[in-house]
Each structure stands twice: as structure tokens, then as C-alpha cells.
């Protein structure tokens, strides 16, 4: 939180993190989309396809952005990560691999 104050109440956090996409499948990866209110939920073993590391907890949530930006919070570990670049990587494969590697390393350090 900010200056020791909560940013979101427990009820708000629970509501925002509720998966609302049902059985919607991500068209690119053919995995459950796990979409909540403006964020993605790490969830099951397909979390790396959603921009999270392979070692984030299922409770982690966040969103990736254009060109390789990513941001997530993992309530289980207390870790949050924001990765910003000054460029736009147009190689989707490299961009995805880098995001998963950075997220996995960060989660491993917290674990």
C-alpha cells in the first residue's frame, strides 16, 4: 500500500480478481484466457502463456503490454514486478520468452 495504507480493500481485490471470461480460449495459445476486470489471472499450469513466470503462484495477477512491457502482483509471495522498455520489440516469440524469463527469475528470488 501507500504509506502503510491499503490501496484496495479485500472485497475489491476479490471482486477484481474473479475470472469473468468463463471458458473463453485465447486465440493465439489455445489456452483458457483467465480474464478478470482488466487483468489476467495467473491460474493453472498455462500461466506462462498469459505473461507470468513458470514459478508465479496461481494467485498472481497483472497484464502485459505492447512491445514486451509487463506488470504483475503475486499476493502469495508479496512480490510485485513492473518491467518497462524504451523500445517496442516486434518479435512476439522473443518478447514472450523474455517476459516469462524475467517473471520466473523474479518469482524465484522471492521464493
Spans of features found by a protein language model:
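Catalytic loop of the DD-peptidase/beta-lactamase superfamily, centered on the K-T-G motif
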Residues: 1-111
